[in-house]
Amino acid sequence: MLTLVAVFGCTAVAAADLVVIVNPGSGVRSMTRDEVAKVFMARYRQLPSGTTALPMDLGPDSLERKDFYMRLLGKQLPDINAYWARLLFSGRASPPHQVANSAAAVDAVAENKGAIAYIDKRQVDTRVRVVLELDD
């Protein structure tokens, strides 16, 4: 039994601390969970500063992606994928752009004024601004 606790304890420690980042030139200093959710679900097309939003998703097999949607919306990836399938079919919206990993997300956000992404907190650097921390 102690072994199981140790294994599960390690898994919990290994889960990434996620943060939402934007370009420092976006004019955004912080965002609420609700604002971030609306940007990533295409309900808001702009960041709070009025800059056109360019949300970035990590790859479909990314653990950070799974954790992000669970922490932010309480939804599993199949639910998120079904949501986007409906919106794509109706022509109402397109899903966020995909990048390979947190490092690529940082690069994309640093290069695009309206970009917004979620990453492993350990990947944050001076080229981006953290606007929300997502705790377990």
Label each region the model flagged.
Residues 1-9:
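Bacterial N-terminal signal peptides
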Residues 16-136:
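Exported/periplasmic ABC-transporter solute-binding proteins
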Residues 10-16:
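Sec/Tat signal peptide C-region and signal peptidase I cleavage site
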